[in-house]
From Swiss-Prot:
The keyword Transit peptide does not apply. Its cofactor is heme. It comes from Euphorbia lathyris. Its EC number is 1.14.14.-. The gene is CYP726A27. This is Cytochrome P450 726A27.
Amino acid sequence: MDLQLQIPSYPIIFSFFIFIFMLIKIWKKQTQTSIFPPGPFKFPIVGNIPQLATGGTLPHHRLRDLAKIYGPIMTIQLGQVKSVVISSPETAKEVLKTQDIQFADRPLLLAGEMVLYNRKDILYGTYGDQWRQMRKICTLELLSAKRIQSFKSVREKEVESFIKTLRSKSGIPVNLTNAVFELTNTIMMITTIGQKCKNQEAVMSVIDRVSEAAAGFSVADVFPSLKFLHYLSGEKTKLQKLHKETDQILEEIISEHKANAKVGAQADNLLDVLLDLQKNGNLQVPLTNDNIKAATLEMFGAGSDTSSKTTDWAMAQMMRKPTTMKKAQEEVRRVFGENGKVEESRIQELKYLKLVVKETLRLHPAVALIPRECREKTKIDGFDIYPKTKILVNPWAIGRDPKVWNEPESFNPERFQDSPIDYKGTNFELIPFGAGKRICPGMTLGITNLELFLANLLYHFDWKFPDGITSENLDMTEAIGGAIKRKLDLELISIPYTSS
């Protein structure tokens, strides 16, 4: 058969040009009539990526600096993705509360699609019936106050073991960052599946890598339609490998859990609850194996970032300010006296420790940027926001805004004395966990762990720096993973305290 060049007919060509003409006309009309938030000059193709990459500055720092120039609501172009950055309590409230439904979605991330079972999870899932059901299960079944309280004995046992290990290493430098990270992950393993995982190090590594992959600044996430770049950058291959590794671990855990389950036994861990709901829950939307895998993976990490990284920051800040450390220690030791241990049921009495936690979360929020996505055309402060626009709320910038906070760079827990401001999503000056429908579901669990860890570290030990480190030269540089973490691990020397 001869190959012949197929030339489109004139009507088709004419229709094509009419179509292009109308698209241009619509685009011009939209740009002429729309009022977009101000923003920096955009380079062709890459947009504002060069400005964010300047000098190796972390994204949330650079966005804060740009917001000082362009205002609390600012447009930036990240490759193909139009984004609006929110940097004040007032505009954050508009997005996270007043227009919560309009901004209830998460931006599409390649990591969420590939690693988290096509967004079958809670944190990155698409807003809709399935997400609402998973969120309800999480709130009422998995992370309710009653459920968290039911795992009190797990926390107490693991913390006791943790303290014994630290005592055995007293007088020598200990990597407190790693020690607390291992503690939080052990607690979450037992809470989620009822036992320590035989390949716990592999699971911890997976959790860390999934968190980093979901940061949202990869080539694939800023050029979502250029599929060839996903491969050329190596990101898609890396995520495929990560998903395969993750799925293999989760499949093994769930299969083993099902095999060992006793008929009629009461659910005593979070995976039991999920499997029971899948079998007997009479749910509006069926709970799939992928839902359970995604939720299990998130439960492993739920509260871990808050607990471990915020403990790290709190200890570092108190080591830099000995008067705060002394005041917090005196309170803990006064409340628990000669008991010899910290009782979780009495932690509510530690009023000053709670101020320390608030101040730590102000300076070091659980997440650097809160991503949302616009679902329908709306306005913020008179500016037009279109569907699919990515919204980035910057809680780090809000927490350090001199218009909101006096001496914002200073660590001063006393600023919260007699203050009604809290971190639970109703005071938009302090939103380390977000707010609204997508507020972090692991907040209560994370805070429970955090307060317990800090109380024990302060009660059982005095602390000093290794040789060469002082409160003046302690490196407080940030790095980005799933949460804002210290660039360098915190190493301290523990000195056992005896109540007598």
